A protein has these predicted regions:
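Terminal, contiguous helix-loop blocks that mediate binding/assembly
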Residues: 18-283
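Low-complexity, highly charged intrinsically disordered N-terminal segments
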Residues: 1-25
Length: 283
């Protein structure tokens, strides 16, 4: 069976409304949803569910075939890795999603496919917002969680080799789904993984990374998405886009009370598996 989760979301970071951000020891929690008991998406406060709690609850019930997050910022490598044992596929966007969300009447046939349902769901979501003249656009992808253990081992080696380049990352040219320094401190930068790898790897290494990523990620993009932060569309350079975001520790996050994203990141399962002791930003 599959699980569809629609609401607001903050990706892998703690809720902006919770006390977890004030206590780094509790900052391992990632959050989804805003539940204030009202049947509306026009809310800015309420209870949120942590991604690790979500994974535990699903595992208790035997897991599911797919999870569709009809919510912003939920396709990150940190989230997919947290859910790797709870679902076979994560379908989501690394960016802001269109306000109307998915058109479930047209997506249901894809959800009930016996095979290739994840690819079909990505295509169905994409088809809703890819027509010429559509004001919203979309970046949507699926992650095959069965491939994540080998991909994380591969990424661990890359991070170890290129740690110095990662910590000196030039952020301005990157495909960024949330611009921390321009849009506010409620979220860190959400860099597209492919954009980051393209900057730090040589041509041969990048070609190999693309091969490895293709075993994990399937992408569809209209070439742009509408951002409520800038009230305009943001164009996507598809050579920079795989449709999955990643966090990179940076000194810009240091000393930001309530927004200690480097410390929060250290407590994610992805950081434990891939970044080891190198997850602290260089000063």
């Amino acid at each position: 069976y599959g699980l569809v989760m629609w609401s607001h979301a903050s990706g892998w970071i703690p809720s902006m409304f919770s006390g977890d951000r004030k206590d780094v020891n509790e900052s391992k929690k990632r959050s989804f949803g805003l539940d204030n008991g009202k049947n509306t998406s026009a809310v800015s406060s309420g209870n949120q569910m942590n991604i690790d709690d979500m994974a535990d609850a699903l595992l208790e019930q035997g897991g599911c075939d797919f999870m569709l997050f009809d919510a912003c910022f939920m396709q990150s490598i940190e989230i997919a890795y947290e859910l790797r044992n709870a679902t076979k596929h994560v379908i989501a966007s690394p960016a802001e999603i269109p306000g109307p969300g998915a058109q479930y009447a047209t997506m249901l046939p894809a959800m009930f496919k016996r095979d290739a349902y994840a690819d079909e769901m990505v295509a169905a979501y994409y088809n809703q917002y890819s027509q010429a003249g559509n004001p919203y656009g979309i970046v949507v992808s699926s992650v095959n969680t069965a491939a994540l253990p080998s991909f994380s081992a591969y990424m661990k080696n890359l991070v170890a080799i290129h740690a110095e380049k990662l910590f000196a990352l030039e952020s301005r040219p990157l495909l960024n789904y949330y611009r921390y320094e321009e849009w506010g401190k409620n979220n860190p930068d959400y860099f597209d993984m492919q954009s980051v790898m393209r900057q730090i790897l040589n041509n041969e290494e990048f070609a190999e990374w693309m091969q490895e990523a293709s075993k994990v990620i399937k992408l569809k993009t209209a070439g742009y998405w509408y951002s409520n932060h800038v009230k305009d569309v943001i164009r996507v350079d598809e050579s920079q886009c795989c449709g999955v975001s990643m966090f990179v520790p940076r000194s810009v996050y240091d000393g930001q009370t309530g927004h200690e994203y480097n410390e929060m990141f250290i407590n994610t399962s992805w950081a434990h598996s891939v970044w080891a002791d190198g997850s602290n930003s260089q000063k």
